[in-house]
Amino acid sequence: ELWLYDIDQERQEKVSLIVKEVVKDLRPSLELKISTDEEETFTDADFIMAQMRVGGLKMRVKDEQISLKHGCIGQETCGAGGMAYGMRTIGPMIHLIDVCEKYASKTYWIVNYSNPAAIVAKATQTLRPNARILNICDMPVEVEARMAEILDTDLSNLEVDYFGLNHYGWFTKVQCNGEDVTEKLKKHVAEYGYVSKASYEDALVKDPDWLHTFTNAKKIVNYFPDYLPNTYWQYYLLGDDIVDYMDINNTRGMQVIHGRETKSREAVTKLENGEKIDLTQFYVGVHGK
């Protein structure tokens, strides 16, 4: 069975309408339950997938805009914006760990997907060192997908060596069907970034912000040619470029509000009116592959 938990009951009820339809379509045998009660939700839970945005998207926009106003990076994972978001998130994340310790199965695992990943990971390690929690980010896998497109191969054919903390890591070796293709990839990325013809045709890279991100990888490789970077290094190593690129009147948070959030609200309205929706837009995308 799958439980959906949120502290915002109104939002929970609306989101659950979409989730019910997706579950019905993809896994009809799965029993879906909705709750805002901690004890009811977490009792005997085995796996807890956590993704919390403390303060909501409106606070994300504030983090971005206040930071940019002062010439700082406002991105949700790092810089001034990430630090502000992290300070809001650490407390609730520690509370979640304590709730799971109290109610969940003794062998529970929390798979934490909440940003800022590195800050939250360090905080949970420090404050709850024995917690059964895995702090993850899917960006390394997404970069691997770009590599596969560059090499014109399937992602499953790649084997990589990677080190670092969540978003901030480096690929030290990449093999394709057993062949070391690290230098080949370095040469491509140094000239084009993590962009290929296939990437331009990919829905993710049609987004100008993502195209800018993947293209920026070439600058990083030319600065540090030993390894292939996770794209999040741009926020540390290309800070001035990022601040200049970001639009204080059209931040990523605002784009999400006007994009995914708007689509979700429109879908909920249709479901409330008994209409059908295109469920494929709510299937797994770049996040959670």
Predicted regions and their residues:
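Metallocofactor- and cofactor-centric catalytic cores in central/energy metabolism, strongly enriched
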Residues: 1-63, 74-78, 82-156, 166-171, ...
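Short amphipathic alpha-helix adjacent to the substrate-entry channel of hydrolases
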Residues: 69-71
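Long, compositionally biased stretches enriched for glycine and/or charged residues
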Residues: 152-289
